[in-house]
Amino acid sequence: MVKAVVVLSSSEGVSGTVQFTQEGSGPTTVTGNVSGLRPGLHGFHVHALGDTTNGCMSTGPHFNPAGKEHGAPEDETRHAGDLGNITVGDDGTATFTIIDSQIPLTGPNSIVGRAVVVHADPDDLGRGGHELSKATGNAGGRVACGVIGLQG
């Protein structure tokens, strides 16, 4: 089993930890707990770069090795990094589990060394009709991020 972790941070008081586990060539299980967000849905994506020198802005676009349009996690046409939304409760906390087959922890399309980004707004899953829907899900600003690192 391969394990990875990201510690999310921000200048806006958002924090959290996200764990990734993958058994063999099976899907990757993502479990997380994020706090300090406003209640509601927030876009949750793997971005292409693990560069946080300019905060979350330098993490690049969504991880998209196949060159597809943005979509929902269950869509055939989607960026590999499109993990949809996390749901934040009235207490400002989101606890979630996602199982996804397009974010491996090993191999040429590994997400290790890339960044996880939590966005300010809901991801419209490419269906919102906004000019940014097919690129970013119109999920708004980047409120927290961190680099995915291997765990022992």
Curated annotation (Swiss-Prot):
Signal peptide: none annotated. Binds 1 copper ion per subunit. This is Superoxide dismutase [Cu-Zn] 1. It catalyses: 2 superoxide + 2 H(+) = H2O2 + O2. The keyword Metal-binding applies. Disulfide bonds join C56-C145. It is found in: Cytoplasm. SUPFAM superfamilies: Cu,Zn superoxide dismutase-like. Cu cation binds at H45, H47, H62, H119. Its EC number is 1.15.1.1. Keywords: Antioxidant, Copper, Cytoplasm, Disulfide bond, Metal-binding, Oxidoreductase, Zinc. Its main location: cytoplasm. The keyword Disulfide bond applies. It is an enzyme of class 1 (oxidoreductase). It comes from Mesembryanthemum crystallinum. GO terms for molecular function: copper ion binding; superoxide dismutase activity. Belongs to the Cu-Zn superoxide dismutase family. Homodimer.
